């Protein structure tokens, strides 16, 4: 097992829990990356949010529920270290990583070895999972590229700033979750909101566009961004109003300091640690240089005197052309002893990466026992995401091929319902958005039922064997 990020940690845990001895290799702290700050397994380098925990209405919340059913270490650690975040599952990042580390170090079947794997694993390693993540070291990345004769794709993830809570001016800002939504561990007032007038917004956008950005290296200049983690200044470049329809949208919130005036835009900050002393700026990933960041972000009402625990940063992210290179069980077609997991495979997000680590671990455990394992049903979140990675996306409706892109879990990856719901329990017809809600709930219910059937048929039988 190479790489002790979220996917690698989850894969190692699944293998060990299945009775398979695991050697887990992690290059940190011997060799650090541009984004990591610690040597702890499962370090969160971007947001501290695992996004929505609503299993009935949201695809990522459904993925949470499926992973919990499968004994996920990552979800167990997240649940034990959650902080208030409205309808989302957010975690104390240090507590979360420490919990994962404690579990791995305490498992009798897991040996954690420090040191970099600088090329392909030795040929006598016959059951290997590579989960080295978006910042795979150059020697290993080049070895993989040489083996596959495929140029890895790459994009950037930008890191959002974190602010000390006690430096936020609450005479201008206020606590409220959008639409007062209450989530796991939350109260409905979990975000700090900073309002902007039209003039303030116009000035802010102009400053973002003019601010000095981080210089690219030659090999980074043509690297595309992933839309799910765009730097805020790149969003601003796409249109003056883009931010007002994205992370700064002023909907579902009322300023108690001036309740009769609707803000033109709103900046939200989300709790970042369990103590509640740190808050991250939601959606404010950035590649601005440090000086301009402080100057520009302190023009936000309520943040004039903000002290930053961490400023935003930028790192490159790489992933495989998985549908071409990997088989249905995440094995490299050119060398099937090597299996890949996590963000390298073209999934995007903490939960998605960990979930692919989970299924890779189950596949590797079945291989170690000399048995097979059928994939999870395509109707499940895990099966839908796996299907995207291993080729479900590759053809368009007209049969033309298109480039493989990283993907968050979403209901668009699921097979359609045989019969879409049209009526409420009382028999009246569903209208407008009610149909969308009912469809999502039906997809989620089908997914959990099908996953339970798959677990009963395959995993419990395997465990008994």
Swiss-Prot record:
- Pfam families linked: GIDA (PF01134)
Q: Name one GO molecular function term.
A: flavin adenine dinucleotide binding
Swiss-Prot/TrEMBL keywords: Cytoplasm, FAD, Flavoprotein, Methyltransferase, NAD, NADP, Transferase, tRNA processing
Which residues are noted in the entry as FAD-binding? Answer: 3-8
Q: Name one GO cellular component term.
A: cytosol
* Cofactor(s) recorded in Swiss-Prot or TrEMBL: FAD
Q: Which GO terms describe its biological process?
A: tRNA methylation; tRNA wobble uridine modification
Provide the E.C. number(s) assigned to this enzyme: 2.1.1.74
InterPro entries hit by this protein? FAD/NAD-bd_sf, MnmG-rel, MnmG-rel_CS, MnmG_N, TrmFO
- Compartments, record wording: Cytoplasm
Q: Which reaction does it catalyse?
A: uridine(54) in tRNA + (6R)-5,10-methylene-5,6,7,8-tetrahydrofolate + NADH + H(+) = 5-methyluridine(54) in tRNA + (6S)-5,6,7,8-tetrahydrofolate + NAD(+); uridine(54) in tRNA + (6R)-5,10-methylene-5,6,7,8-tetrahydrofolate + NADPH + H(+) = 5-methyluridine(54) in tRNA + (6S)-5,6,7,8-tetrahydrofolate + NADP(+)
Q: Which domain of life is it from?
A: Bacteria
Q: Which PROSITE patterns match?
A: GIDA_2
Family in the record = Belongs to the MnmG family. TrmFO subfamily.
> Per its database record, what is this protein's job?
Catalyzes the folate-dependent formation of 5-methyl-uridine at position 54 (M-5-U54) in all tRNAs.
| UniProt name for this protein | Methylenetetrahydrofolate--tRNA-(uracil-5-)-methyltransferase TrmFO
């Amino acid at each position: 097992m190479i790489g002790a990020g979220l996917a690698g940690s989850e894969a190692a845990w699944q293998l060990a829990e299945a009775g398979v001895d695991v050697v887990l290799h992690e290059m940190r702290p011997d060799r650090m990356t541009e984004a990591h700050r610690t040597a702890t397994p499962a370090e969160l380098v971007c947001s501290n949010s695992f996004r929505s925990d609503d299993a009935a209405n949201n695809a990522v919340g459904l993925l949470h529920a499926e992973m919990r059913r499968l004994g996920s270490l990552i979800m167990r650690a997240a649940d034990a270290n959650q902080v208030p975040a409205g309808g989302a599952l957010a975690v104390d990042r240090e507590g979360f990583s420490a919990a994962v580390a404690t579990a791995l170090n305490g498992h009798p079947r897991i040996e954690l070895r420090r040191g970099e794997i600088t090329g392909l694993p030795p040929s006598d390693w016959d059951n290997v999972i590579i989960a080295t993540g978006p910042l795979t070291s150059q020697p290993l990345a080049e070895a993989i590229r040489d083996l596959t004769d495929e140029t890895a794709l790459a994009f950037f993830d930008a890191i959002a700033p974190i602010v000390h809570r006690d430096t936020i001016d609450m005479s201008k800002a206020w606590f409220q979750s959008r639409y007062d939504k209450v989530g796991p561990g939350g109260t409905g007032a979990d975000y700090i909101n900073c309002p902007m007038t039209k003039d303030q917004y116009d000035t802010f956008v102009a400053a973002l566009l003019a601010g000095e950005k981080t210089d690219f290296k030659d090999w980074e200049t043509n690297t595309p961004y992933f839309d799910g983690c765009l730097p805020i200044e790149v969003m601003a470049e796409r249109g003056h109003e883009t931010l007002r329809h994205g992370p700064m949208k002023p909907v579902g919130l009322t300023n108690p300091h001036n309740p009769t005036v609707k803000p033109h835009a709103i900046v939200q900050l989300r709790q970042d640690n369990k103590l509640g002393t740190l808050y991250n700026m939601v959606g404010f990933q950035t590649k601005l240089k440090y000086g301009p960041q402080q100057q520009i972000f302190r023009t936000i009402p309520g943040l004039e005197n903000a002290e930053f625990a961490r400023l935003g940063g930028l790192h490159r992210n790489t992933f495989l052309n998985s549908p071409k290179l990997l088989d249905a069980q995440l094995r490299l077609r050119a060398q099937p002893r090597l299996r890949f997991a996590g963000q390298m495979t073209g999934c995007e997000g903490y939960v998605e990466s960990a979930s692919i680590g989970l299924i890779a671990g189950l596949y590797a455990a079945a291989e170690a026992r000399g048995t097979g394992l059928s994939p999870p049903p395509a109707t499940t979140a895990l099966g839908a995401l796996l299907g995207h990675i291993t080729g479900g996306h590759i053809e368009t409706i007209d049969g033309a091929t298109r480039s493989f892109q990283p993907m968050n879990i979403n209901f668009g990856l699921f097979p359609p319902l045989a019969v879409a719901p049209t009526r409420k329990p009382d028999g009246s017809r569903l209208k407008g958005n009610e149909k969308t809600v009912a469809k999502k709930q039906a997809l989620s219910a089908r997914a959990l039922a099908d996953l339970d059937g798959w677990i009963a048929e395959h995993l419990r039988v395997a465990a008994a064997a």
